[in-house]
Amino acid sequence: MVENLKQLQERVAVSDGRAKADLVIKNGRIINVFSGEIMDGDIAIKNGYIAGIGSFPDAEKIIDAAGAFIAPGFIDAHVHVESAMVTPAEFARVLLPNGVTTIVTDPHEIANVAGEKGIEFMLEDAKGAPLDMFVMLPSSVPATEGEHNGETLHAEKLHPLYRHEKVIGLAEVMDFPSVAKGSDDILRKIIDAKKEGGRIDGHGAGLTSADLNNYLAVGIRTDHESTTAKEATDRLRAGMFVMLREGTVGRDLLQTIPAVSEKNSHRFCFCTDDKLINDLITEGSINYNIKLAIKNGIDPITAIQMATINAANCHNLPYLGAVAAGYQADIVFLTDIETVEISKVLKNGEVVVDNGVRNEAAFKQQAAVPFVSPPINHHVHLQDLALPLTKETCYVIGMQPNSLFTEKRIEQVTIQGGKFVPTVENDLLKMAVVERHHDTGCVGVGIVKGFGLTEGAIATTVAHDSHNIVAVGVSDEAMKAAIDHITQTGGGIAVVNGAGQVLHDLALPIAGLLSDKSYEEVENDLAGLLNAFKQISTANGFDPFLTLSFLTLPVIPELKLTDQGLFDFATFQIISNEVN
């Protein structure tokens, strides 16, 4: 919030007892994130900020905390709103009951489809919600040069967006080879971010401690891609803030939390990165990360520091992350600090959640933000899905449940008539990526293992990060039926059976990424999709749709598929499906 002179004068008057506070919270046990103590005291709030901690006997309104622990609002240090497949305003409705009052988001999903207009849509839609949504401008649109996306964002296109008060830096720099080569465009983006006083986020998936030197040398200071305690420690020692991730697919917290100690915890914070709406509802958001950390040996106050002041320091947000004078009155009441049971949430001094019930009056009723989605533009034919082969020994994308990484496998496959034929008994299925933005006719076809399909196909327009159409199936006919269906609906997800009949779908009319419906409706459709998937697959224990969407992301090891073909992370090049 931007303050004016009158507001500061009113706050000072409250702090020294000359005026009443708007609100005073009494009888709470305040978690001091600076000292690590639990303290007593009244919390006086004026104009959405904390005016003081101490004795404040009078106020316009008093809340009796009745012994609850008082924590700062939780901060998600790195999240892609689009992965929840709802608009920012709907996203806020899910997060606030989980104690999350601030997010730092990278809207590179919608930017890959719609460029600057997509970023502007996200910023505008978030205005109606009692949630701080800070934006890191997408650094890598597209993620690599080896695929087609909807828009390309060079430095000169990004720079004007820094004028927006909610834009605070440059998002995850994924194109590591361009950094290592000193490419002009990525370095210009980094220089612009520095000039604007912004942070620069990293994306160090698979990078060694030696590789990190390139990142640090140009000013990249954060990373959220650690999957082991060693990787987290390497990044810590290099001078980075380390975000410990727990999302839907990227579930890394249990593997990385051993890196946290009493001496170094101030350099760690939490993020979700990508989390589906159903997981946000059933598990939670950053509150779930806190719970997991506590269950795995982290002191509760330390875990709360990681979720609040550490994240604020990481992103240079000086008035967030603490219950102290001069800080924004973003406050979470906890009935139990060990289990992180939330009873009340305040945003800017206003109660937005009470005993799990949202205060809908706190959400500004604004008209839907207009957004004209780019059309889905392709003409794929059945023959385009064929995979000609001359050798039975092929590279196969080995899907790994609950991981963004894949395995570069070598398998013996079946060939009939010079073409690959999926074999259900070996779980060797066909995968295709269809370029959907410019009708280039580009279709990448490969082989994947891990989905356990017995018939049919699934397809989605959510395909990181270029968001072309991706499908996996037992037959070309079923794959085409699924592709055709989501094309007709303007984007989305579909499950079809062996006869090509649609078992369930979810329409995503906003850029093929977001629903225009409530999060409750999206949750119902996701449940329907999962039930439909179970009808055609023997696999379980992971989300097949978000997992599929990451099999197209070439900046995470080891083997991925783009509209240009099979992408090998180790060489950062397109390779043949056949093993030479």
From Swiss-Prot:
Recorded catalytic activity of this chain's protein: adenine + H2O + H(+) = hypoxanthine + NH4(+)
Keywords, in A-Z order: Hydrolase, Manganese
Named cofactor requirement(s): Mn(2+)
Listed Gene3D superfamilies: Metal-dependent hydrolases, Urease, subunit C, domain 1
Domain of life: Bacteria
Signal sequence range: none
The protein's Enzyme Commission number: 3.5.4.2
Coiled-coil regions listed in the entry: none
Enzyme class per UniProt: hydrolase
GO BP of this protein: adenine catabolic process
One of the Pfam families matching this protein, by short name: Amidohydro_1
Molecular functions per Gene Ontology: adenine deaminase activity
NCBIfam families the record matches: ade
Homology family: Belongs to the metallo-dependent hydrolases superfamily. Adenine deaminase family.
Protein name: Adenine deaminase
Originating species: Listeria monocytogenes serovar 1/2a (strain ATCC BAA-679 / EGD-e)
Organism classification: Bacteria, Bacillati, Bacillota, Bacilli, Bacillales
Designated gene of the protein: ade
